[in-house]
Amino acid sequence: MSARIVVVLNQKGGVGKTTTSVNLTHALAKLGKKITVIDFDPQSHLAVSLGSVDTQTSGIDKVLLEGASLAEQSIPVRKNLNLVVAGPRLQEIEQLTDGGARRGDLLRRALLDGNRDEDFIFIDCPPSSGVLVANALFAADEILVPMTSDYLALQGLSHLVGTIRKFESALKRPYKFSLVMSRYIPARRMSKEVLSVIQKYFPGQILATTIRETALLAECPSFGKTIFEYRPGCRSARDFMALAEDFLEGRMM
């Protein structure tokens, strides 16, 4: 079986990207899907959010730089959910000067192993546009973009879509592309205005459930817990479970 490779990407920071990666993957795992999530950000926020605090453990850095297998570097962190940490050398990928265009194809080649049994491989990207993001985009089947409902995020989305179009042109294939509204404040007028603009330009590409802004989601990472462990049954946990169901069923606004 070939896993579906989902890149969680936004070149703007502070949009709930890692929060989405952590809680969506755990929700999918709770629904019985087999998931591997790769921390592809040298800051290692995803791994810390899942309770893996040893940032010196090798992970995807060893896969890309030394040819280790992904299976060797996978750590079971929850039922049905494996983690591949960033590793202390991941930042070296950005400084690679040898290999030409192959520098951007390291991850795709590492994921070609057909003996894996995951349903999904999620890649949590850094908020940048360098060699790491290029590797993720060359490997991706699908791109999931967390978005906040403010105008700066809207500007950043325009730039990101331009980047994605260039990769689609180079690969001669389209990505499956969807947006998730993160840190959404229903009572705020700007939230509704920005969502309306996004719906106009991306019809049928916004997952149906919005992730509402709550303090609980900001608190979880410091305890190394997902929202389902930190406050099971709360509004945010319900939001992420509904989002996971939207994701599986292709349910859009």
Residue ranges, per PLM feature:
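P-loop NTP-binding core
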Residues: M1-M253
